[in-house]
């Protein structure tokens, strides 16, 4: 659940990674913007926010781990020849991978009364001080037991602390059954997949609350006017083409898949050699899921350490398939424009529950009252 904003200057990204870790999300997000986002950014404002320590209290922002996984999977490995389907321009997919951590939003009427918030669209790159204040306020409220939905909050807070935490492969609250979390995850994967392949009833002008996806009518009933385009491109007219929206939707799906391999989000068993998905030998099965964690009662810094580059390196050195293997398989299915009914068996396999799967909790290694354990990526 982390982020990374690649502004034009590498020094700015270094400053942010070194000085300003944010509260935890999943694989980390860096405060550097993609090329797609840079046109929206106010670089001087962002620099002042960083230099002023706006993000110092947060552990979720630091290194561009999500982006690195996406690049390795879609732009193909450094070893060996360039394989068919390897891409160079993945800017929209990267924007989508970042969207789950930093969805653009506008305040509900009567809300948004933070000192540094202005009218209009809020994102880390456009209103960084406002963004940090909203995030930290949401985190504090969630720890007090406030439940966030479309009735009382915005996308940023809902996705990190509220009813949309499944955007990071996490449970909405402690004690949620693994079956319920999995249903929420699979509903989002269905929506983003069908959008990403350009399915007829999932074009950018469709109303999100009316989509034929389990749970969407209830989840977005307070957002009746939202189109798919509004969800993924609020405040950014430059990406309002069908192709751009499709690739952003794919990136959002990849974020959920990637987060499911981050140990601060999901506890998995180790993969078992020879076990495959849906009887296909070219689909080796990842480790089964033992628990979806929930964030509000986690220690944000422990969560954040699990999302750093060393955590990814340890994960990639373990048993396969690892997260990059899985993302590559998903990308291959997407390039073939595989219909949802044919792609679903693989994604269901990626989120297979162990027979001993438990209800959600912060996770023993991530509780705010637990000793400082070494944390790492899941199996």
Protein language model features and the residues they cover:
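Active-site alpha-helix of zinc metalloproteases
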Residues: 247, 251
């Amino acid at each position: 659940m982390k982020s990374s904003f690649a502004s034009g200057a590498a020094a700015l990204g270094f400053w942010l990674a070194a000085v300003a870790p944010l509260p935890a999300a999943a694989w980390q997000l860096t405060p550097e913007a993609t090329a797609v986002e840079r046109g929206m950014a106010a670089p001087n404002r962002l620099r002042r926010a960083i230099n002023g320590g706006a993000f110092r209290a947060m552990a979720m922002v630091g290194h561009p781990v999500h982006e690195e996984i996406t690049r390795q999977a879609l732009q193909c490995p450094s070893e060996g020849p360039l394989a068919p389907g390897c891409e160079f321009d993945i800017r929209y997919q990267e924007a989508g991978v970042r969207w789950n951590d930093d969805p653009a939003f506008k305040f509900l009427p009567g809300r948004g009364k933070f000192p540094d918030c202005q009218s209009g669209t809020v994102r880390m790159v456009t209103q960084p001080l406002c963004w940090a204040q909203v995030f930290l306020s949401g985190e504090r409220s969630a720890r007090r037991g406030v439940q966030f939905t479309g009735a009382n909050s915005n996308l940023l807070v809902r996705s990190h602390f509220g009813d949309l935490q499944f955007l990071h492969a996490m449970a909405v609250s402690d004690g949620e059954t693994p079956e319920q979390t999995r249903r929420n995850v699979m509903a989002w994967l269905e929506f983003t997949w069908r959008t990403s392949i350009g399915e007829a009833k999932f074009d950018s002008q469709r109303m999100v609350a009316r989509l034929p996806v389990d749970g969407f009518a209830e989840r977005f009933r307070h957002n009746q006017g939202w189109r798919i385009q509004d969800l993924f491109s609020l405040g950014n007219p430059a990406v309002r083409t069908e192709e751009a929206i499709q690739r952003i939707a794919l990136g959002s799906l990849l974020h959920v898949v990637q987060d499911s391999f981050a140990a601060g989000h999901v506890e998995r068993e180790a993969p078992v050699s020879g076990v495959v998905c849906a009887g296909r030998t070219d689909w080796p099965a990842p480790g089964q899921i033992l628990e979806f964690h929930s964030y509000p009662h986690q220690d944000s810094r422990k969560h954040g350490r699990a999302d750093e580059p060393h955590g990814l390196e340890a994960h990639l050195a373990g048993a396969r398939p690892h997260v990059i293997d899985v993302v590559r398989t998903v990308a291959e299915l997407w390039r073939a424009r595989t219909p949802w009914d044919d792609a679903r068996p693989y994604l269901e396999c990626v989120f297979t529950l162990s027979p001993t799967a438990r209800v959600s909790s912060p996770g023993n290694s991530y509780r705010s009252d637990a000793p400082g354990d070494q944390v790492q990526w899941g199996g």
